[in-house]
Amino acid sequence: MEQVKIGFLGAGNMGSAIMRGIAGSKLSEQVALYAYDHMPEKTAALAEIGVTACASEAEIVKQCKYVFLAIKPQQFEATLPKLADGITEDTVIVSIAAGMTPDYIRSQTKPNAKVI
């Protein structure tokens, strides 16, 4: 069975906590975790649990079917347009940021994007 690829934009408190939870669970064998953070030392610290660091936001979207937006709301405007070209009909975007609606995320990426 092929591993499900899950990517995280942001490896701060929330993003890293979710990644550590997945890595420490029964799901860990079924999932490949990827992360990008503008502070590379944050993704480097997650290598010990098997997280693959990506070089850019766009790389996360290219690599992963599921993309968690674990960034601060004020970072959305600059970050979301960088994702648009890589989003396909199979991509699922999961936002954990307060106040960011699916409609706003679609308006900054692709109108038909799957957003939770």
Task: Please give the residue ranges for each predicted region.
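Rossmann-like NAD(P)(H) cofactor-binding subdomain of soluble oxidoreductases
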Residues: E57-L69, P73-I116
